[in-house]
Curated annotation (Swiss-Prot):
This is Tropomyosin Per a 7.0101. The keyword Repeat applies. SUPFAM superfamilies: Tropomyosin. Transmembrane segments: none annotated. Pfam families: Tropomyosin.
Amino acid sequence: MDAIKKKMQAMKLEKDNAMDCALLCEQQARDANLRAEKAEEEARSLQKKIQQIENDLDQTMEQLMQVNAKLDEKDKALQNAESEVAALNRRIQLLEEDLERSEERLATATAKLAEASQAVDESERARKILESKGLADEERMDALENQLKEARFMAEEADKKYDEVARKLAMVEADLERAEERAESGESKIVELEEELRVVGNNLKSLEVSEEKANLREEEYKQQIKTLTTRLKEAEARAEFAERSVQKLQKEVDRLEDELVHEKEKYKFICDDLDMTFTELAGY
């Protein structure tokens, strides 16, 4: 009987232990289920986060590609702008060189104009000198004509005296020797007068030749003055053309400077846009 009681007590104890063990196992099972559910929830949450991150990554990659494409376009625009700026600088340099050459040509034309003006002044002075000399020659010619008239008058007087001597020789034969002497004296005087007349004639011819030469020189000087006047007009025309060319080049330089300012503003706008793009990329 005691053995049965002991056995029943032992079985009851085993039962209690089994119940406790079962309760413990159930609790552990519930805890395991809770942990499993929590793990599944965390896994789903992580999956959502991973999906969101992948979506964000795709958007970021797409934005990065757009930004890179935009950056490439900006680089190309910047290169084009730099090329245009270089071309404009080259054009400005060429225009400045043309302007310098035009200024040199203008200076040369101005110097030639001054030389031509000086030559005209010298020609005018020479013309005035020739006019004065021509007046002096005319006065000398008048004086020589007067001398010639006097010589002719003296010759006529000599002829009269010769006739008188001849008549006296015919009328007074006794006074032949004295009359001959007087006749010889008259002849000598006639010879002298003829020589003087010949000299006057030669002088007159020389004066005529000098007058012809003076007229020729005057014509030459007139031709030189005409040529110099033509050259002066041509120089003035070249100077006016050079001045118009300089004004035209100045307008072209002003226009190129305006284009350069516009390109600089365009270049600044591109740089600002690039800075903004880099700032946006840095924010990502």
